[in-house]
Amino acid sequence: MARITVEDCLEVVNNRFELVMMASKRARQLANGVQPLIENADASDKPTVMALREIAARRIDNALIDEVEKAERERAEREALEWAAAEVVADEDMSKNDD
């Protein structure tokens, strides 16, 4: 695959700070298992490179990154609530067995 450069990404994102923030957030999402939005993604690419490729290809923007973060946060909260509910049920079962 062609080499991606910061200049390629700066054609899409206005400044370097914003580019770094977008790329780091997206790379974290990719590292945590979110599927890449570019076709023919090279499996050997590290998450940071994949994030930069998505930005340069105009497949990702701040709104989409925020949407994915929100969905991941809601999923984590839901799992935490389910875990807590399961612990309460287990504690109740154990206290019934103690009686």
Curated annotation (Swiss-Prot):
* Recorded GO CC terms: cytosolic DNA-directed RNA polymerase complex
Judging by the UniProt lineage, the source's domain of life is: Bacteria
Which GO terms fall under biological process for this protein? DNA-templated transcription initiation
Spell out the InterPro entries in the cross-references.
Answer: DNA-dir_RNA_pol_omega, Pol_omega/Rpo6/RPB6, RPB6/omega-like_sf
Sorted UniProt keywords: DNA-directed RNA polymerase, Nucleotidyltransferase, Transcription, Transferase
As recorded in UniProt, its EC number(s) are: 2.7.7.6
Among the GO molecular function terms of this UniProt record, one is:
DNA-directed RNA polymerase activity
Q: Does the keyword Protein transport apply?
A: no
Reactions the enzyme catalyzes: RNA(n) + a ribonucleoside 5'-triphosphate = RNA(n+1) + diphosphate
Could you tell me which Pfam families the record lists for this protein?
RNA_pol_Rpb6
| Function field | Promotes RNA polymerase assembly. Latches the N- and C-terminal regions of the beta' subunit thereby facilitating its interaction with the beta and alpha subunits.
The family this protein is said to belong to: Belongs to the RNA polymerase subunit omega family.
What binding partners and quaternary form does the record give? The RNAP catalytic core consists of 2 alpha, 1 beta, 1 beta' and 1 omega subunit. When a sigma factor is associated with the core the holoenzyme is formed, which can initiate transcription.
Q: Which NCBIfam families match?
A: rpoZ
Q: What is this protein called?
A: DNA-directed RNA polymerase subunit omega
Which species is listed as the source? Xanthomonas campestris pv. campestris (strain ATCC 33913 / DSM 3586 / NCPPB 528 / LMG 568 / P 25)
